Swiss-Prot record:
Lineage: Bacteria, Bacillati, Cyanobacteriota, Cyanophyceae, Nostocales
Encoding gene (name): psbJ
Biological process, per Gene Ontology: photosynthesis
Assembly behavior: PSII is composed of 1 copy each of membrane proteins PsbA, PsbB, PsbC, PsbD, PsbE, PsbF, PsbH, PsbI, PsbJ, PsbK, PsbL, PsbM, PsbT, PsbX, PsbY, PsbZ, Psb30/Ycf12, peripheral proteins PsbO, CyanoQ (PsbQ), PsbU, PsbV and a large number of cofactors. It forms dimeric complexes.
Protein name: Photosystem II reaction center protein J
UniProt source species: Trichormus variabilis (strain ATCC 29413 / PCC 7937) (Anabaena variabilis)
Similarity remark: Belongs to the PsbJ family.
Length: 40
């Protein structure tokens, strides 16, 4: 693997993307669950 070209390592991109997806999905499900709980 060549580490030239100054690009961000793929594992860093994958980690940040994974954390972002988990955070967004978690907030979405928490918001939906809280909304359902308050409406019932």
């Amino acid at each position: 693997m060549s580490a030239g070209s100054g690009r961000i390592p793929l594992w860093v991109v994958a980690t940040i993307a994974g954390l972002g997806v988990i955070t967004v999905v978690g907030i979405f499900f928490y918001g939906a669950y809280a909304g359902l709980g308050s409406s019932i």
